[in-house]
Amino acid sequence: MELRHLRYFVAVAQALNFTRAAEKLHTSQPSLSSQIRDLENCVGVPLLVRDKRKVALTAAGECFLQDALAILEQAENAKLRARKIVQEDRQLTIGFVPSAEVNLLPKVLPMFRLRQPDTLIELVSLITTQQEEKIRRGELDVGLMRHPVYSPEIDYLELFDEPLVVVLPVDHPLAHEKEITAAQLDGVNFVSTDPVYSGSLAPIVKAWFAQENSQPNIVQVATNILVTMNLVGMGLGVTLIPGYMNNFNTGQVVFRPIAGNVPSIALLMAWKKGEMKPALRDFIAIVQERLASVTA
């Protein structure tokens, strides 16, 4: 007994007419009749009652029809699941914070496409907490994110540290300085980032000011780094953010390095523990190769 026998039987059982069933199956009526006889011989009981006027199911045929439908549905589902696995293996979903968009993805994606030309890449801009949750749920293959990572289900690798810089309005009294100390920021109006959205940036900045015995005057909390920089450009205060944001400078702010003890923020690459699909293994390897070539 093969699946084609079940398909032929179901077509006849649903049409209760050999001619219409044969047309639906794109086969001849004699061939269809032969397949049904083979099936009945295999089962060992009649499944259909045939006469010149009609076709009907026997009691055994009624029962067999339900099982045949279930088997065909299971076979179709098995085929779809197998195809889905192959399709998922050929897709890589990458979450990223803005820093990775500027400093990493342009360098590694061309290399990845050369190594995995048939893999579909999906890029998703997400904050760190969203990336961690989606990695844990299997909705994201890899995340380029910040500390902290709370889930024990996730592995991660620190890629590099990015020094923070001072960003000031162009007309700020400190804008003419070549570099700025923590002491110069004591009491200065300051735009902070919301730790819910910025990951470890806000705690790093807070800890640095405490270590340097400097206390800025926080006048605004922003939901992301770009908004923070725009608020600085509007003259609300100064801020500390990674230097890569100078790529988005519209001329309303100036970037100045920090003198002395310079705080930094790490960029991480994170993925779910366990077996990796080939595309993920290649992406991780390419990122590591790229970083090794830069530091060599």
UniProtKB/Swiss-Prot annotation:
<feature type="domain" description="HTH lysR-type">
    <location>
        <begin position="1"/>
        <end position="58"/>
    </location>
</feature>
<dbReference type="GO" id="GO:0045893">
    <property type="term" value="P:positive regulation of DNA-templated transcription"/>
</dbReference>
<dbReference type="InterPro" id="IPR000847">
    <property type="entry name" value="Tscrpt_reg_HTH_LysR"/>
</dbReference>
<keyword id="KW-0238">DNA-binding</keyword>
<keyword id="KW-0010">Activator</keyword>
<dbReference type="Pfam" id="PF03466">
    <property type="entry name" value="LysR_substrate"/>
</dbReference>
<dbReference type="Pfam" id="PF00126">
    <property type="entry name" value="HTH_1"/>
</dbReference>
<comment type="similarity">
    <text>Belongs to the LysR transcriptional regulatory family.</text>
</comment>
<dbReference type="GO" id="GO:0006355">
    <property type="term" value="P:regulation of DNA-templated transcription"/>
</dbReference>
<keyword id="KW-0805">Transcription regulation</keyword>
<comment type="function">
    <text>Transcriptional activator of the hca operon for 3-phenylpropionic acid catabolism.</text>
</comment>
<dbReference type="GO" id="GO:0003700">
    <property type="term" value="F:DNA-binding transcription factor activity"/>
</dbReference>
<dbReference type="GO" id="GO:0032993">
    <property type="term" value="C:protein-DNA complex"/>
</dbReference>
<dbReference type="InterPro" id="IPR036388">
    <property type="entry name" value="WH-like_DNA-bd_sf"/>
</dbReference>
<dbReference type="GO" id="GO:0003677">
    <property type="term" value="F:DNA binding"/>
</dbReference>
<feature type="DNA-binding region" description="H-T-H motif">
    <location>
        <begin position="18"/>
        <end position="38"/>
    </location>
</feature>
<dbReference type="InterPro" id="IPR036390">
    <property type="entry name" value="WH_DNA-bd_sf"/>
</dbReference>
<dbReference type="GO" id="GO:0045892">
    <property type="term" value="P:negative regulation of DNA-templated transcription"/>
</dbReference>
<keyword id="KW-0804">Transcription</keyword>
<dbReference type="InterPro" id="IPR005119">
    <property type="entry name" value="LysR_subst-bd"/>
</dbReference>
<protein>
    <recommendedName>
        <fullName>Hca operon transcriptional activator HcaR</fullName>
    </recommendedName>
</protein>
